[in-house]
């Protein structure tokens, strides 16, 4: 994570970005493609190139619209910050496929962006009844975190980490960044992340987030000194050095 702000992830469906990248690569080859690209595939290429308005026009011109296509149109509008349009197309997707976890998750991200965190939580939980997804659990945790429900947030983040040990390290499809969180709240998030990694024995990452939370002015160093999750870390030179360092707020 670069600055490691908390993020909400949009869902396009399994392997969508990989497929789009493969199509982009195909267009760069010297030999012509074995078959003409469909409108949906052309739209996927435009999405991969961040040409969202052009992607919308291309998807819209496809007469064979299905739930996946409506979800993709919603994502394109979402990337353009046209949240109401995005929500309309996500809802169209759910009408066609009521168990469409990705579209339900994305409706949740719209409500999250509008700071309607309770509704976002409701949609994330609906999505999780269908799909046991690490990224949706992470989104759920972020929504709880925004409501300062830290116990529930930590539980959801733990569920995400259990399903994907690197969920917080390789998330590339960012949606709405939680930029309205203050430094104190970011410090709390990084403390919780450090604790989860320490509990799983991933000491290098745990130390990284201990450092981050202290740099952001985490006020309760006593927790770091006493929480049982950090017991193995407390014997390391790196941890001792971090604890001896004077706190400074970035």
Predicted regions and their residues:
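Long, contiguous interaction/recruitment modules in multidomain scaffold/adaptor proteins
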Residues: 2-37, 48
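Terminal, low-structured helical/coil segments at or just beyond the last alpha-helical repeat
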Residues: 21-36, 180, 184-187, 197, ...
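Short coil turns that delineate tetratricopeptide repeat
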Residues: 33, 64, 98, 131-132, ...
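Alpha-helical segment of the N-proximal tetratricopeptide repeat
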Residues: 34-82, 109
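Canonical tetratricopeptide repeat
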Residues: 41, 72-75, 106, 139, ...
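Position-specific recognition of the canonical hydrophobic site in helix A of tetratricopeptide repeat
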Residues: 47, 71, 75-78, 95, ...
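Structural signature of tandem alpha-helical TPR/SEL1-like repeats
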Residues: 48-57, 79-92, 114-126, 131, ...
């Amino acid at each position: 994570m670069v600055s490691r702000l908390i993020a909400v992830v949009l869902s396009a469906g399994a392997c969508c970005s990989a497929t789009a990248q493969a199509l982009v690569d195909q267009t760069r080859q010297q030999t012509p493609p074995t078959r003409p690209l469909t409108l949906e595939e052309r739209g996927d290429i435009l999405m991969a190139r961040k040409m969202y308005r052009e992607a919308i026009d291309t998807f819209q011109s496809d007469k064979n619209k299905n739930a996946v296509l409506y979800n993709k149109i919603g994502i394109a509008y979402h990337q353009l910050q046209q949240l109401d349009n995005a929500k309309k197309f996500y809802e169209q997707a759910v009408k066609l496929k009521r168990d469409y976890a990705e579209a339900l998750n994305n409706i949740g991200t719209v409500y999250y962006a509008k700071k309607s965190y309770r509704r976002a939580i409701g949609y994330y939980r609906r999505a999780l009844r269908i799909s046991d997804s690490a990224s949706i659990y992470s989104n759920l945790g972020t929504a709880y975190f925004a409501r300062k429900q830290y116990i529930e947030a930590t539980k959801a983040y733990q569920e995400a980490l259990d399903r994907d040990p690197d969920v917080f390290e390789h998330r590339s499809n960012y949606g709405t960044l939680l930029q309205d969180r203050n430094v104190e709240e970011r410090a709390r998030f990084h403390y919780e992340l450090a604790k989860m990694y320490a509990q799983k024995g991933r000491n290098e990452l745990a130390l990284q987030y201990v450092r981050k939370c202290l740099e952001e002015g985490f006020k309760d160093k006593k927790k770091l000194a006493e929480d049982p999750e950090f017991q193995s870390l407390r014997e390391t030179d790196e941890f001792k050095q971090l604890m001896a360092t004077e706190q400074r707020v970035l």
